């Protein structure tokens, strides 16, 4: 076999630009080995280095008195009271999920679970944020089916409930679906494990599954656009085993109950390379690996293959000296591989040995903290033209049926029913029951409120407003349950950052997110960036997905959206009828134009704090924020959840019925209460806009402008899309 020629062309095929390869040559002072080039290519990939976004991410607010660990660790950590901490993060598996939908989605779930339990937390909930292409295309149906089965197959088997998420459709995702997975875990605050290696001479231990050839250069693939050859990249998709993951969780948590661990890191993107480099780099030490000791699933694996493999269900641990036998006994009890594969050194370098040869010897700093950092050219996104007058071709009732049955609003029961949302017995509110999932903290009355949110059509119209709106909708959804929002994890999904227009979207969205987080005291504590989400030059809609976490003192008292008969309905917040970039505009008029609804961050905070106070005071029996589709959609969703009709009140003068019912003005909630007049009076005293909307009861939605629809008709429209699609 001829030896591989190491040159700029090979480096380019690995994802390194010409100037980056020149930088490698300068750092090394020689031509790198194949293994060294592979290590540089994955560590300098967009997926691992954040080289295009890092300077902008640093502008985000990340601290608060309740934040224990912010960005920089495997996941964010926040104080949730009673000596406990919530550990959570969201991460993407976009590119693999188009090539191999089932395994791409499944291993996305597995990877984010490991990010959380590697810090000492028992995972208690999974969520997701999914974006798919045009439903009329056969490929979209194939991807949706595979992704949903993959999420359910992995999460159900590993025993962690999938409790919430969101799903949108748009042609921009035709060749590039987004699969963003979020995991939340709970740990004792004094038992949190970090990834910084320490202790010269300490053993470095490999645990979990054996290493195979799956996933090699997965991080590089996730840092490039798709072309017409996407199907040929199937070997770069990892293969997961949720049963092994379950054993790995239990074995790691058992070891964590001892005092044996110095540092621990999962082998995620870039596998053994990223885990070893990050652990040693964070600790300011060196690391030496002997690949002869790595458990291997396939014969004849090279050092290059072992270092870049992304085989799943693997962890790297630095142990205290003398604890190897005790740790080995734990992992062998759980029928997992355990091997001492290296040691910590004082060299500040990563040294990789295999079959008596040194295959890599690289200074760590250029691989991690001193990796390339770019301030790419960008242009400020143009503000959209004003929408102008909009007429409706349909009366409100017919428009409601069309909207509530459209792919973006149709019932997700077909999806939810494939997920086990109650395994573990702590889920108090599932999808469709409340604006956020509610998961009880074991051994406590307290509970977590969890949600994922983003409105991509706002983000493409105005990335700054869209980025901010994703944050505030997350905050509203948590607030509507009565919980206090604490912190955010994000997943920034964009196109090619080398294009100034796309880079401008990234900059503007991050700016908007930061403004909203500061206004709401809602810091970002972890996250992920997924760029190059383009297929043959066409980018996805900018999609800065937000995962929100809050806490409520009594989870059983969390407010849902289901109406009971005999309640007054009150609208909290101002309505002017903003239809720009709305779902009504897209689905009814087939238009995607106009500015998204304006944001008033002070009003968001004021209105939300008022709603939360009233929930705590027992004045609100059900609550729903107003978002996609506007007010009439929110009311219909509440009616369906409680199987109770509504007699709607007259609308205010001076606003068109379709604008009132379907405008997507922000900072609004529908509150159901036993005494509407009293709630409106409380709002007036607090300077909060509020108006009566009607009263619950019966089995129809009735009101002005000819609205008279039975709940059965609304339900049939709402449930038809997925049932028909997958019949």
Curated annotation (Swiss-Prot):
UniProt pathway annotation: Purine metabolism; IMP biosynthesis via de novo pathway; 5-amino-1-(5-phospho-D-ribosyl)imidazole from N(2)-formyl-N(1)-(5-phospho-D-ribosyl)glycinamide: step 1/2
Major place of residence: cytoplasm
Gene Ontology CC annotation, any one: cytoplasm
Signal peptide: none
Positions that bind ATP: 50, 89, 490, 527
EC number: 6.3.5.3
Entry's Gene Ontology molecular function annotations: ATP binding; magnesium ion binding; phosphoribosylformylglycinamidine synthase activity
Alphabetical UniProt keywords: ATP-binding, Cytoplasm, Ligase, Magnesium, Metal-binding, Nucleotide-binding, Purine biosynthesis
A GO biological process held by the record: 'de novo' IMP biosynthetic process
Top EC category: ligase
Positions with a binding annotation for substrate: 92-95, 114, 238, 310-312, 530
Residues that coordinate or bind Mg(2+) 1: 91, 528
Subcellular location: Cytoplasm
Family annotation (InterPro entries): PRibForGlyAmidine_synth_PurL (IPR010074), PurL_linker (IPR041609), PurM-like_C_dom (IPR010918), PurM-like_C_sf (IPR036676), PurM-like_N (IPR016188), PurM-like_N_sf (IPR036921)
Catalytic residues identified in the record: 47, 93 (proton acceptor)
Any Pfam family: AIRS
Superkingdom, taxonomy of origin: Bacteria
Residues that bind Mg(2+) 2: 115, 266
Subunit-structure text: Monomer. Part of the FGAM synthase complex composed of 1 PurL, 1 PurQ and 2 PurS subunits.
Free-text function comment from the UniProt entry: Part of the phosphoribosylformylglycinamidine synthase complex involved in the purines biosynthetic pathway. Catalyzes the ATP-dependent conversion of formylglycinamide ribonucleotide (FGAR) and glutamine to yield formylglycinamidine ribonucleotide (FGAM) and glutamate. The FGAM synthase complex is composed of three subunits. PurQ produces an ammonia molecule by converting glutamine to glutamate. PurL transfers the ammonia molecule to FGAR to form FGAM in an ATP-dependent manner.
Stated family: Belongs to the FGAMS family.
HAMAP family found in the cross-reference section: PurL_2
Protein name: Phosphoribosylformylglycinamidine synthase subunit PurL
Organism: Acidiphilium cryptum (strain JF-5)
Taxonomic lineage: Bacteria, Pseudomonadati, Pseudomonadota, Alphaproteobacteria, Acetobacterales
Gene name of this polypeptide: purL
